[in-house]
Amino acid sequence: MHGQKDYDLNAGKNLVFSGQNGAIVLKDSVTQGAGYLEFKDSYTVSAESGKTWTGAGIITDKGTNVTWKVNGVAGDNLHKLGEGTLTINGTGVNPGGLKTGDGTVVLNQQADTAGNVQAFSSVNLASGRPTVVLGDARQVNPDNISWGYRGGKLDLNGNAVTFTRLQAADYGAVITNNAQQKSRLLLDLKAQDTNVSVPIGSISPFGGTGTPGNLYSMILNGQTRFYILKSASYGNTLWGNSLNDPAQWEFVGTDKNKAVQTVKDRILAGRAKQPVIFHGQLTGNMDVTIPQLPGGRKVILDGSVKLPEGTLSEDSGTLIFQGHPVIHASVSGSAPVSLNQKDWENRQFIMKTLSLKDADFHLSRNASLNSDIKSDNSHITLGSDRVFVDKNDGTGNYVILEEGTSVPDTVNDRSQYEGNITLDHNSTLDIGSRFTGGIEAYDSAVSITSPDVLLTAPGAFAGSSLTVHDGGHLTALNGLFSDGHIQAGKNSKITLSGT
């Protein structure tokens, strides 16, 4: 085999296999350099114990299924191209990674005698064409799965999988389940970037400017003292001594390591509270659960959800379904999206049930929701003006979220809801957009400002209030039953029919 020669990767040659149902056994480890392997028919590739392969990648032509029983090496990625299927079926822990841009990769690595198994240390999907199928939940650490430009499909294949972080560049990132057995996806999104750099600036004795929250130092009486800046500028430290002003400085000791750790801990605590946004899609036969997250972390979905037989559950946090701002070319360093732009893409959210407990849910602009909602001590806003934009959207860089408000100018940009809502235990429902469906409220409150609310099922309000505000219009096709207060504001309208 023509492989890498010394340090010359280009010495590696491409190899094309065209025989039918062939078998290849590696007697030694192979470093093929820039050479790739192309399979025009189905093959099985294995290796003697401990032998590995590295090279430019593997191409599986359309209609082929290559069974790959060879592990890689740490720090190297197996590149998969071609419309065919690559089934990973080695043994033990494969320390190498996977980058796939086409076709299907089935992860079916087998455990070694100690029970250890890992198909890849990391998986990256890009181009929108690849699919990765999980043989079981142990094949790869979900937190090491990422989606690049246009992404690809991760098929959970009936497994229960937990993510503590989602790394998705755009709408092409898809998490799905095509198996008959329902998958359970837990989005315990508490992970954060722990790589924190803490530079130490010098304090000018004559005053100056700096970055609030950053660490600074000054030598006083032969001793280095460390301070955290509290304001954008600070005064003279020679007279008037601004170091003693708690509005300008916070003294954090004389131990450099402890001072650095104090700043680092605060940065990490701040990151834990930062919202999480997923630009991709959740589809197929699965239930999705978002548990209570640290710091009251908000979760924003501006991709889409299509779980016609599934339940999405939110516990003790803020959940926002919204459309997606159209990405624009950057001009003179401007962000690709902004809160005040007028053009947004519509997004659909379809599920059997949206379950809310102690939660705050917003259906915002350019989002349509088709689902029943079960609410326990939660607040629901349909037609919310609350939105988030990712200032690095479409760049592939680290997410930078900006929160604000955005009110649609046209009817087509307004949110829409269709389904039946059950409110329990002091839940509240604010309807400010088009609503079609039913409402059952128990010890809860409903407030309507939308001129387009249609109850197609009998409305039931037990121990609950109903308020139709100025300009609101409620039409109940099958009657309205209430033992509580019903209030109608000026220029509001309640239309009843049926019994």
Which sequence ranges carry the predicted segments?
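Acidic Gly/Asp/Thr-rich repetitive segments characteristic of extracellular carbohydrate-active
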Residues: 1-14, 102-104, 113-125
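Extracellular, surface-exposed repeat architectures
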Residues: 4-5, 10-90, 134-197, 254-305, ...
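Short, well-ordered loop/turn sites that connect or cap secondary structure elements
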Residues: 9, 100, 209-212, 314
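His/acidic/aromatic-lined binding-pocket segments of jelly-roll/cupin-type domains
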Residues: 77-79, 96-99, 122-123, 310-312, ...
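Glycine- and acidic-residue-biased ligand/ion/polar-headgroup-sensing regions
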Residues: 84, 99-110, 128-130, 297, ...
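Beta-strand-dominated lipid-handling architectures at cellular/organellar boundaries
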Residues: 111-119, 126, 311-313, 318-320, ...
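Short loop/beta submotifs within extracellular cysteine-rich repeat domains
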Residues: 113-115, 233-241, 327-328, 389, ...
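Tryptophan-rich substrate-binding surfaces of secreted polymer-degrading and adhesive proteins
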Residues: 196-266
